[in-house]
Amino acid sequence: MNESNEALEAAILYAKKFLEDLLSFFGVNLDVYATRDDEVIQLSVPSTQLNGFLIGQRGENMRSLQYLVSTALKNNGYEYTRVNVDVADYKRHRADRLATTAEEWIKKVKDSGEPMELKPMNAADRRIVHQVASDAGLTTESVGEGRDRHIILKPAAE
């Protein structure tokens, strides 16, 4: 195993243990499933009776857990600090639902020939919409700042 892989494996083990310890403060004692996707540490928390609490409104608590793990990695000198935390496959299910909704928006734009301005969404959701729209041949543009950042779907230029 080369030095880079060893550093990533060490970061994965640290992140897994840190999240398990953090969850234990909430009375959740379980084994977090840890993998890697390129240089992103993927941490999957199995379903528990506290799913709603751990996920939070629109995934806010889950993003906070992700931030805490990433910050702990940085503060402890790990080179790899990009982390994705998913509780009970929430992100995967949300991405699937969002892709289906995006396909409906795309159909409306194609049928009307008019651009459609979407409501503000987080960066992860915008990435999904950009990808689905690109695959369907539409042009997208992100506009706004911070929590007001949103996408404009545009018909493809003829």
Name each region found by the language model.
Residues M1-E158:
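RNA-contacting regions in translation and RNA-metabolism proteins
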